[in-house]
C-alpha cells in the first residue's frame, strides 16, 4: 500500500509517518530528504525536480508498503494517481507556528541568535510558513492543498492536527487495515 501524509509545515506529517513506520511494516520516506541537498546549515539548496523525482520514485518502488510525508503538490501530476491513501493533517496556525519556532530553536540552538545568515534563513522560513492560510499566497497554502486533494485519485483522510499522536496513529492504522481487508 502506498500512503501520503501531507499538510502545512509544522502540522505533524513527519511525526505521524515515523510513528506509523514504528508500528507497521511500512517504510517511511520524507520528501525533505529528496527536496534539499545535504548542507550545513540544512535546507539551503534545492535538488532539481527531475533529480528528486528520480530518486524518490526509485525508493518508492522498492517497497510494497511505503508512507511518504510532505507536500508533493509541485512534484508533478504523476504523483496524483500513485497513492492508495492520502492523509491531510490540518493544524491551526497559532499552534503550528509555535511548533515551528520551537523546532527552529532546537535545530539551530545558539546560532539562531548569533549567526546572521541563520537568523535571516529562519525568519524567511517562518514568514513563508505563516502565509499558509492566506488564500492569496502563491506558495504552499491551505487553498492549494484543498484544490490538490480534489485531483488525487485515492481516498483522502482528513485529520485534526490537535489530536494526540496515539489517536492519530490509531485512526490511520484503522483506515489502512480497513482498506487492506476490503
What are these language model-derived features?
Residues 127-182:
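NTP-dependent small-molecule kinase module
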Residues 90-140:
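A glycine- and Lys/Arg-enriched "phosphate-lid" helix/loop adjacent to the NTP-binding pocket
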Residues 8:
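P-loop (Walker A) phosphate-binding loop of NTP-binding proteins
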Residues 14:
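Walker A/P-loop
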Residues 18, 22-61:
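Conserved substrate/cofactor phosphate-moiety recognition/catalytic segment
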Residues 49-94:
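Glycine-rich phosphate-binding loop used to anchor ATP phosphates in small-molecule kinases
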Residues 5:
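Hydrophobic anchor at the beta1->P-loop junction of P-loop NTPases
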Residues 11:
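ATP-binding Walker
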Amino acid at each position: 500500500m502506498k500512503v501520503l501524509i501531507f499538510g502545512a509545515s509544522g502540522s505533524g506529517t513527519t511525526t505521524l509517518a515515523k510513528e506509523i513506520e514504528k508500528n507497521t511494516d511500512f517504510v517511511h520516506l520524507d520528501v525533505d530528504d529528496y527536496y534539499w541537498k545535504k548542507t550545513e546549515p540544512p535546507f539551503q539548496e534545492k535538488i532539481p525536480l527531475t533529480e528528486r523525482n528520480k530518486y524518490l520514485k526509485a525508493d518508492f518502488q522498492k517497497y510494497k508498503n511505503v508512507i511518504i510525508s510532505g507536500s508533493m503538490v509541485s512534484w508533478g501530476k504523476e504523483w496524483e494517481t500513485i497513492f492508495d491513501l492520502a492523509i491531510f493533517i490540518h493544524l491551526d496556525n497559532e499552534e503550528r507556528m509555535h511548533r515551528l519556532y520551537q523546532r527552529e530553536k532546537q535545530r539551530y540552538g545558539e546560532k539562531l541568535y548569533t549567526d546572521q545568515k541563520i537568523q535571516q534563513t529562519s525568519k524567511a522560513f517562518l514568514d513563508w510558513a505563516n502565509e499558509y492560510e492566506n488564500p492569496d499566497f502563491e506558495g504552499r497554502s491551505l487553498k492549494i492543498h484543498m484544490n490538490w486533494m480534489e485531483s488525487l485519485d485515492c481516498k483522502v483522510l482528513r485529520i485534526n492536527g490537535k489530536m494526540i499522536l496515539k489517536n492519530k496513529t490509531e485512526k490511520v492504522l484503522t483506515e489502512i487495515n480497513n482498506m487492506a481487508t476490503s
